[in-house]
């Protein structure tokens, strides 16, 4: 890391440097574009170009100052056709108030005023100059400044501010957008001091594969054992080992009244009496006397 020309207050913390290295923001490609040579630190024996992350940090601060100088945040357009950067630009837009274009860039967005999606931004920020070439080309037609995340092999034509970084890894892209958003909020005063921690974690800016998330949920559901896995015999033995009649009778336990009633079977011949005798009318008593008097309406 080269000596920084920034004031001491803007120097990165050790945690920031560790995050940049852990996300592999310093690993470029094996090709080198001539305009990206000033940001090169060294070339590894395997041919991979290593980016100077000190220059990366300086360009993040420069880009944040440009973004914070625009009064209306909606006049800033953040673009990413690369899938790894689409979640990051949407999160950046939600935290800073910018306008996000995630996915395919419709030709004519900046030049054809007849289209419904026509926009007139004051600044655009792109994730990759190669995949977002259409947006950069149209911005050059209407004099819109361009900030871009550039790898060592990225074309820098019509790019005004290049942030040297690895723009192909999902962690590197998400981290750069997160650092840029945090720095913009610091300059705007949303974060009181530079020592104030931002409560938004960097993981929210990382790309997540929908299919992988769905497969993970299916795998978690498959971990719950069913009757097919533990066997029908184990289920039956589990039920057989329990005594269902040992529960104390209680009002709140369903089935206790039924268990008590069926515990001792009733013998219908226990009395040994005559059913006809029990249903016969008492001696000296007439049916007419026992019938109730008719009501008179």
UniProtKB/Swiss-Prot annotation:
Residues 256-289 have a biased composition (Low complexity). Keywords: Cytoplasm, Ribonucleoprotein, Ribosomal protein. GO terms for cellular component: cytosolic small ribosomal subunit. The keyword Cytoplasm applies. GO terms for biological process: cytoplasmic translation; ribosomal small subunit assembly. One of its GO terms (molecular function) is structural constituent of ribosome. It is found in: Cytoplasm. It comes from the Eukaryota. HAMAP family: Ribosomal_S2_euk. Required for the assembly and/or stability of the 40S ribosomal subunit. Required for the processing of the 20S rRNA-precursor to mature 18S rRNA in a late step of the maturation of 40S ribosomal subunits. Belongs to the universal ribosomal protein uS2 family. Component of the small ribosomal subunit. Mature ribosomes consist of a small (40S) and a large (60S) subunit. The 40S subunit contains about 33 different proteins and 1 molecule of RNA (18S). The 60S subunit contains about 49 different proteins and 3 molecules of RNA (25S, 5.8S and 5S). Interacts with rps21. This is Small ribosomal subunit protein uS2.
């Amino acid at each position: 890391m080269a000596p920084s020309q920034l004031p001491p207050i803007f120097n990165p913390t050790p945690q920031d440097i560790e995050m940049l290295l852990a996300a592999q923001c310093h690993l470029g490609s094996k090709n080198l574009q001539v305009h990206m040579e000033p940001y090169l630190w060294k070339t590894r024996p395997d041919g991979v170009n290593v980016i100077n992350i000190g220059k990366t940090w300086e360009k993040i601060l420069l880009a944040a100052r440009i973004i914070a100088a625009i009064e209306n945040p909606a006049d800033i357009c953040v673009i990413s056709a690369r899938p790894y950067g689409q979640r990051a630009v949407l999160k950046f837009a939600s935290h800073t108030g910018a306008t996000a274009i995630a996915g395919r860039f419709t030709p004519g967005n900046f030049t054809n005023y007849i289209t419904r999606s026509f926009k007139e931004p004051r600044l655009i920020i792109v994730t990759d100059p190669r995949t977002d070439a259409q947006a950069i080309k149209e911005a050059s037609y209407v004099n819109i400044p361009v900030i871009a995340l550039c790898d060592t092999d990225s074309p820098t034509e019509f790019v005004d501010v290049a942030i040297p970084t690895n723009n192909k890894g999902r962690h590197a892209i998400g981290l750069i957008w997160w650092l840029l958003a945090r720095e913009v909020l610091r300059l705007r005063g949303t974060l009181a001091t530079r020592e104030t921690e931002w409560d938004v974690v960097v993981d929210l800016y990382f790309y997540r594969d929908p299919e992988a998330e769905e497969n993970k949920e299916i795998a978690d559901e498959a971990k719950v054992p069913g009757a097919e896995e533990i066997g029908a015999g184990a289920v039956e033995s589990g039920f057989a080992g329990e005594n269902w009649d040992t529960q104390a009778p209680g009002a709140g336990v369903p089935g206790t009244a039924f268990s008590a009633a069926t515990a001792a079977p009733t013998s219908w011949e226990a009395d040994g009496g005559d059913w006809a005798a029990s249903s016969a009318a008492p001696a000296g008593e007439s049916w007419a006397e026992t019938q109730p008097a008719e009501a008179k309406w």
